[in-house]
Design a protein with these regions (language model features):
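Positively charged n-region of N-terminal signal peptides that target proteins for export
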Residues: 1-4, 18-20
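Sec-dependent N-terminal signal peptides
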Residues: 4-15
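Outer-membrane beta-barrel channels and translocator barrels
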Residues: 20, 62-66, 118-122, 187-189, ...
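Outer-membrane beta-barrel "beta-signal"
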Residues: 22, 186-188, 220-237
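Residues on the lipid-exposed face of transmembrane beta-strands in outer-membrane beta-barrel proteins
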Residues: 25-29, 53-61, 73-75, 109-115, ...
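Extracellular/periplasm-exposed beta-strand and loop segments of Gram-negative cell-envelope proteins
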Residues: 33-50, 78-107, 136-179, 199-227
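Acidic/histidine-enriched, beta-strand-rich ligand/metal-binding domains
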Residues: 67-70, 74-80, 104-106, 116-122, ...
Length: 237
């Protein structure tokens, strides 16, 4: 067993030394979606989209015959907004109009297995799949309410990570997704895009399952993301 372990380490070291390595920067568009799935309907309820930007560093290593790995460190920002809309509550006479503004900030560490195939000199198409660890920094909504004649108004801000603010719907800061995608590379320039599926329930389970959905443990949330990135490799071995 010891010999096998040593051989595996030596083999990985040799492959890494022979790999075609790139280090670069990337930026692009990200659209994150919070979803609530129920087993009864089979559909996503209350999806909320956040449009934003992604920027970060990427390491790309082609190890053998087009197969390799990419790793990155990204910062992602997203925001959404609603138009003024009517609401039906006991306060309707005082504040019948509401709107909201939301935003989130997070750090991401993607690790993807990748296959590149060369279609022309120093020109490749690529396919990739792999997990991403997301760590939330800020996730908040701000609500605005006003009367029809705009004489009365107030604002209210909620921290979606706070149990005090969100009661039964507080979110976890850590999330894991699994992504699939494709891309194109010409010399040092590349374009990559894909979709990340949330693997864990982002809602704090003891509140979300036991309080809001008691007796239905299969009801869960998801935090997904569309993304497309442009980049340039600044260093190549």
């Amino acid at each position: 067993m010891k010999r096998i372990s040593i051989l595996a380490v030596v083999l990985m070291t040799v492959l890494t030394l022979q790999a075609q390595d790139y280090i670069g920067v990337q930026f692009g568009y990200a659209r994150s979606l919070t979803r609530l799935n129920t087993p009864e309907s089979g559909k996503s309820l209350n999806p909320t989209g956040y449009n934003g930007l992604k920027v970060g560093f990427v390491y790309d290593a082609t190890i053998v015959k087009g197969f390799g790995v990419t790793m990155g460190l990204n910062y992602t920002f997203g925001a959404n907004a609603t138009d003024w809309m009517k609401k039906a509550t006991i306060q309707q006479g005082l504040y019948p109009q509401i709107r909201s503004r939301g935003q989130y900030h997070q750090v991401e560490i993607p690790v993807d297995w990748q296959y590149k195939f060369e279609i022309a000199k120093r020109t490749w198409l690529m396919l990739y799949t792999g997990p991403t660890l997301q760590c939330g920094l800020i996730f908040k909504d701000k609500w605005y309410a006003r009367s029809d004649n705009k004489s009365n108004a107030f604002t209210h801000e909620e921290n979606l990570y706070s149990e005090e603010d969100m009661e039964d719907y507080a979110l976890k800061r850590l999330n894991v997704t699994w992504g699939i995608g494709a891309g194109f590379q010409y010399e040092r320039y590349f374009l990559r895009g894909g979709y990340d599926f949330g693997l864990i329930n982002p809602y704090k389970a003891y509140q979300f399952t036991e309080v809001v959905n008691d007796g239905n443990p299969r009801t869960r949330g998801r935090f997904d993301q569309w993304q497309i990135k442009l980049g340039i490799y600044l260093w190549e071995k």
